[in-house]
Amino acid sequence: QFNARAWVQMAKDAGMKYITITSKHHDGFCLWDSKETDFDVMSTPFKRDILKELAEACREIGGIRLCFYHSIMDWHHPDYNERRTWEKDRPVAGTERNRYISYTKKQLK
């Protein structure tokens, strides 16, 4: 039942100047059609790019900005960080920090 135009219009009618949405939280799940991972909204039964729809609605309606909170942390990615004492399901060693940085930069383009 997600309706980007309705969200944007409601925000504008309430006098808001911007909308902020979490594009990717620490769990690594992406609310857009990511080319870098299948851990995204397009791999769910919903199969719609939420961020794209919100961006289009903001442009069409006008007068309201769209902002993103994008977590650099990504617990889902195997190269994010080596395991800390409370994380039993992550490797103790062997993560590739540079590979994770490259992955993150590609997502931000």
Q: Model-flagged regions — what are they?
A:
Residues 1-109:
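Mature catalytic domains of secreted/periplasmic carbohydrate-active enzymes
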